[in-house]
Amino acid sequence: MSYAIIQTGGKQYKVKAGEILKIERLEDSKPETKIEFKEILAYGDDKTIEVGSPVVEGAKVEADLVENGKNRTILIFKKRRRQNSRRKNGHRQQYSLIRISKIFSKDGKVLSEAEKMVKPTKKVEKVETEVASK
């Protein structure tokens, strides 16, 4: 199974095809769009590894944006004792949820590809009810 180490949002992630990942929010991106990551620090599989200095030129990772959202609230509470001085603040960090679809090598060959994601459709069965009459 191939993997790649990508850099986005000031952080580094080890990704595999088909994996769902929560990363820092990507600007100007709408759900159901394709995203390309070109800052690939390394990629490889069980046998070989290709390490860049600092990035591997020509390698890329394609992903699908699943959704944009906000994490849960983190409370910041500051208090100065015996002075009746306190401050309460909250913060919700924004994130993007992505699904890795393809990993490309520096030659442009596809190293690994995720299976097609089929959206489940709701199957509605007709239910008949009998009304009791008096």
Curated annotation (Swiss-Prot):
Q: Which UniProt keywords apply?
A: Ribonucleoprotein, Ribosomal protein, RNA-binding, rRNA-binding
Q: Which GO terms describe its cellular component?
A: cytoplasm; ribonucleoprotein complex; ribosome
InterPro entries listed in its UniProt record: bL21-like (IPR028909), bL21-like_sf (IPR036164), Ribosomal_bL21 (IPR001787)
The family database entries (SUPFAM superfamilies) matched by this protein are listed as: L21p-like (SSF141091)
Among its keywords, does the record have Chloroplast?
Answer: no
Q: Name one GO molecular function term.
A: rRNA binding
Q: State whether keyword Transcription regulation applies.
A: no
**Per its UniProt record, what Pfam families does this chain match?**
Ribosomal_L21p
Lineage, top-rank taxon, reads Bacteria
Q: GO biological process annotations for this chain's record?
A: translation
What this chain does, per the entry, is described as:
This protein binds to 23S rRNA in the presence of protein L20.
What PANTHER family does its record include?
Answer: 50S RIBOSOMAL PROTEIN L21, LARGE RIBOSOMAL SUBUNIT PROTEIN BL21M
Q: Extract the HAMAP family matched here.
A: Ribosomal_bL21 (MF_01363)
The entry assigns this protein to a family as follows: Belongs to the bacterial ribosomal protein bL21 family.
- Self-association or partners: how does it assemble? Part of the 50S ribosomal subunit. Contacts protein L20.
What protein name is recorded for this chain?
A: Large ribosomal subunit protein bL21
Q: Which taxonomic lineage does the organism of this UniProt entry have?
A: Bacteria, Pseudomonadati, Pseudomonadota, Alphaproteobacteria, Candidatus Pelagibacterales
Q: Gene that codes for this?
A: rplU
